[in-house]
Amino acid sequence: MTVESLIQQDETFQNPDYFQVHNLFTVRDLFDARVHFGHKMGSLNENMKPFIFGHRFDTVIFDLDKTAFHLRQALNFLAHVAYRNGIILFVTRSPSSMLMVEKMAIEIGEYAHTRNWETAILTNSAVS
C-alpha cells in the first residue's frame, strides 16, 4: 500500500480543514492580542519582508492576514500529528516563556526543550 492510497482512504485528508482550525481565532483576535507588533526595524531579518505590512515609530507591523493564513496551516498540521498520536516537541529559548512552555507540554502529555542548545542543532542536521 502506498502513501498516496493511504491518504486517499483517510477522510481527514479529504477536507482541507477537517479539524475546523479556522474557527479558533479571527484576524481581529490577533489584532486585539497585539500580534501585529514586531521588533525594531534595525533587527529585521530579510526573510521576513514578505510578511511585513509596514512599520510605525521604527516598529515592524506584521500583516495579520498572512499571519492568520500561516498560523491556521500550522495548527492544521499539528492537529493531524496529534490525531495520529504523533510526538510534538515545544521549543523555546526565551527565559520569559520557558516555564509556561514546559508547563503546557506536561499538561497535554507532550515534550519541551527550553534550555540553551547549539545553534542550528534542531533545524540543520548537517551542522550537528
Label every model-predicted segment:
Residues M1-S128:
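Acidic-enriched and Gly/Ser
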